[in-house]
Curated annotation (Swiss-Prot):
Protein name, UniProt field: Nucleotide-binding protein YajQ
The species this protein was found in: Salmonella paratyphi A (strain ATCC 9150 / SARB42)
Keyword Chloroplast recorded: no
NCBIfam families: PRK05412.1
Tagged with keyword Nucleotide-binding: yes
Keywords: Nucleotide-binding
CDD domains associated with the record: YajQ_like
Entry GO MF terms: nucleotide binding
Family from the record: Belongs to the YajQ family.
Superkingdom field: Bacteria
Cellular component aspect of the GO annotation: cytosol
Lineage: Bacteria, Pseudomonadati, Pseudomonadota, Gammaproteobacteria, Enterobacterales
PANTHER family from the UniProt entry: UPF0234 PROTEIN YAJQ
Annotated Pfam families: DUF520
Length: 163
């Protein structure tokens, strides 16, 4: 029986490349000359720290970062940015987390979405991914379109497609 897995992963190498591109653009922009503005990726806990001298500049840096990550194939929804920025002495910063894996609440929504579609497929939650099996390839492709179309708050990838 054909099957595939629904996952939500961020390629850390592409994230590193996107951060490097954003840093290069910040260094060359006129409005950031002479200003303490940094963007740094922490591989260990999968966060990106954005630091600047004002909250407005932090927002500008986040916009630059999102644009560069999007060019590298990482959607903006996979970046979890808190609403509040942290202010310490003369700098503002925010630590944005890269979403890895699918949370259990979102997994349940996906399984419910698949079951409500009345397609002849089965969905099983396996750790941080969802295995979908069915008799026909067309049903599996319909499930892929359904999951992409459903507004669930994060991007999904499909892997391990087997016949």
């Amino acid at each position: 029986m054909p099957s595939f897995d629904i996952v939500s992963e961020v390629d850390l190498q592409e994230a590193r490349n996107g951060v490097d591109n954003a840093v290069r653009e910040v260094e060359s922009r006129f409005d950031f000359r002479g200003v303490e503005a940094t963007i740094a990726l922490n591989d260990a806990n999968k966060t990106i720290k954005v630091l600047s001298e004002s909250d407005f500049q932090v927002n500008q840096l986040l916009d630059i970062l999102r644009a560069k990550l999007l060019k590298r194939g990482i959607e903006g929804a996979s970046l979890d940015v808190p609403d509040e920025f942290v202010h310490s002495s003369k700098t503002w910063y925010v630590e944005a987390k890269l979403k890895q894996g699918i949370e259990s609440a979102v997994q349940k929504k996906i399984v419910k979405l698949i079951k409500d579609s009345k397609l002849k497929v089965q969905a099983q939650i396996q750790g941080e991914e969802i295995r979908v099996t069915g008799k026909s390839r067309d049903d599996l492709q319909s499930v892929m379109a359904l999951v992409r179309g459903g507004d669930l708050g994060q991007p999904f990838q499909f892997k391990n497609f087997r016949d």
